[in-house]
Swiss-Prot record:
Cofactor: binding comment: Binds 1 zinc ion per subunit.
Pfam families named in the record: QueC (PF06508)
Name of the protein this chain belongs to: 7-cyano-7-deazaguanine synthase
Record's keyword annotation contains Ligase: yes
Binding site for Zn(2+): 191, 200, 203, 206
Residue runs in coiled coils: none
Keywords: ATP-binding, Ligase, Metal-binding, Nucleotide-binding, Queuosine biosynthesis, Zinc
The protein's annotated pathway: Purine metabolism; 7-cyano-7-deazaguanine biosynthesis
Catalytic activity: 7-carboxy-7-deazaguanine + NH4(+) + ATP = 7-cyano-7-deazaguanine + ADP + phosphate + H2O + H(+)
Function text: Catalyzes the ATP-dependent conversion of 7-carboxy-7-deazaguanine (CDG) to 7-cyano-7-deazaguanine (preQ(0)).
Cofactor(s) named in the record: Zn(2+)
HAMAP family: QueC (MF_01633)
Amino acid sequence: MTNQNLNKDKAIVVFSGGQDSTTCLFYAKKHFKDVELVTFNYGQRHDAEIEVATRIAKEQNLKHHILDMSLLSQLTPNALTQHDMDIETGEDGIPNTFVPARNLLFLSFAGALAYQRNAKHIITGVCETDFSGYPDCRDSFIKSMNVTLSLSMDKDFVIHTPLMWLDKAQTWELSDELGVLDYIRHNTLTCYNGVIGDGCGECPACQLRQRGLQHYLEAKGAN
């Protein structure tokens, strides 16, 4: 397998403007000389996500690619793209915010972009510890996707998942170690209802984020 055209110092970050992907952004800036961002517009529940991602990219002076993935909303009804659908968890334990094949498609397009931009590294904020029932956030899926992308383009890509084995408290700890905890707390969008920063406090994403922050700050204060 040839990788002679890939820049080992260049990374593409799958970026939504949320806590996890913004932590990955700063992780990438620490570990790679050349960082670019890719955001997918798939008709997500809150349009503000694209605006937040664009603003953060500009503030960090990073090249930002926005790709149209609106076809995702046509595949299956889900609470991330259907604004009138209440967020619920099914009998199988998978919440209706799950978008089938989302990460499969996102990583495929991120890989195609990395190929065009000569980037060896792809960074995504998926996490198995707090994977919320999403099967495409599992480590086994990411490893298989890494092999598939490399074989499909005859390039030796490396998919990085710095948050894979971290819970939310540990993700906050990582952002603190990177010196950006306050920035991420006040400028990112995790809330399913589109409230920037600490969010609405009611949706599952906000509750998970706030619980993790509280646990981290309590542990930090005890040390």
